[in-house]
Amino acid sequence: MPALSGPQYLGEGLKLIMRPGLRLFVLIPLTLNLLVFALLIGFAMQQFSHWVDLLMPSLPDWLSFLQYIVWPLFVLLVLVIVFFTFTMVANIISAPFNGFLSEKVEVVVRGRDDFPPFSWAELLAMIPRTMGREMRKLAYFLPRALVLLVLSFVPGVNLIATPLWILFGIWMMAVQYIDYPADNHKLGWNEMLAWLRSKRWACMGFGGMTYLALLIPLVNLVMMPAAVAGATLFWVREEGEKALVK
């Protein structure tokens, strides 16, 4: 199968999840994500102004005019942090379903569209492994996010915090979603990261498009399973199975 550009994988993933045989595996995580989204957005709307004020640097009177320049930057910073929180929580909750969706997408992509009957036992058996993998992602994410969060409170330095958050977020989107097919094939965490680094620009293209799509409220609910499907297509077409034999 020919490889695609990084951003194309997300679009192809969206087409894949519309297939009748995959809809059940999309609807379950979609419903869970909707509940998480509603709860988090309700809380964020109540706290948004407070968070922006907390992060905004205190400027002397003679520099007060700069407030109108830097305020949008800190609004964006809060939005990025809220986005990260939603994505992280939603993916932890949906991890077993996302792993199962990735498995079924790969069956379709490789041309064997003969799904076995849905089995709750099979799904339940995936929970310990997928949740363990999500904790590994969290252990990778949190120290780096903490450094960026500290930078967000350092006057002057916090002006570069937003672009750093965005670049880190793009990379994490690739890690988050491409790990589902990698984990299904029992590829180790460090080996998976090494393989992604070898495909760095394709990963950043896929991660960047996914990042942008997930920033759009409500649209992001559909794009999360689309990202799982797109990442699975990425794994197949970029020949991820070769990483298994190194």
Curated annotation (Swiss-Prot):
Recorded name of the encoding gene: cysZ
The UniProt record lists the keyword Protein biosynthesis: no
Chief subcellular location: membrane
Keywords: Amino-acid biosynthesis, Cell inner membrane, Cell membrane, Cysteine biosynthesis, Membrane, Sulfate transport, Transmembrane, Transmembrane helix, Transport
Source superkingdom: Bacteria
Protein's UniProt name: Sulfate transporter CysZ
Disulfide bonds: none
GO biological process: cysteine biosynthetic process; sulfate assimilation
Organism placement in taxonomy: Bacteria, Pseudomonadati, Pseudomonadota, Gammaproteobacteria, Pseudomonadales
The family this protein is said to belong to: Belongs to the CysZ family.
Membrane topology: Multi-pass membrane protein
Gene Ontology CC terms, in alphabetical order: plasma membrane
Any GO molecular function: high-affinity sulfate:proton symporter activity
Pfam family, one: EI24
